């Protein structure tokens, strides 16, 4: 009977350990081959540091870039004026936030973010579904956002919204990316098709 020498046995253990570690490191790491494919062209969301993840959003026909609300958190937004109703154009907005890895696992962070949104907007009908984005942990949410009064004559009517959140880790920092689509006419067939494509084709990838 063949016997393993101590050196061979140690080598086998080391190899197994290395394989296990590599598997743990790759778990939840996004990659291009895991992204969903859609027919709409993709637009790159500008990054502000070399550490931030690469984000890309599908832009269906009729949707256009709008920079009116861009700020530190809101990184990209598109709208479709042709689908406007009640003085509101359907929008798709991409946000990016930083969270310390000490906050917990990605799934916990996404759940906490959803709880904060629910409290802030006083939502009562939120539904969530775990998912992935290019292989990274994700959380899909659906809800109706309440009316927003911005002035005596300026009101944003209630909107049906769907959000897709996902998390990317870079060192000791989590980047939480969210794309949210919303409209006042959720039954519009064009909006339904476009919004589904935007959420399905959204990409989150390593910066390098």
Predicted regions and their residues:
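Extracytoplasmic
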Residues: 50-54, 87-91, 136-138
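Hydrophobic alpha-helical segments that drive targeting, anchoring, or assembly
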Residues: 70-74, 90-99, 159-161
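Solvent-exposed loop/turn segments at secondary-structure junctions
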Residues: 100-101, 145-148, 183-187
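Short, well-ordered beta-strand elements
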Residues: 92, 173-184
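N-terminal targeting sequences that direct proteins away from the cytosol to non-cytosolic compartments
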Residues: 2-77, 82, 155, 181-208
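Short glycine/proline-enriched loop/turn "hinge" motifs that connect secondary-structure elements
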Residues: 83-86, 166-173
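Signature of long, low-cysteine stretches enriched in small and polar/charged residues
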Residues: 110-168, 196
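A short acidic-to-branched-hydrophobic micro-motif
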Residues: 79-108
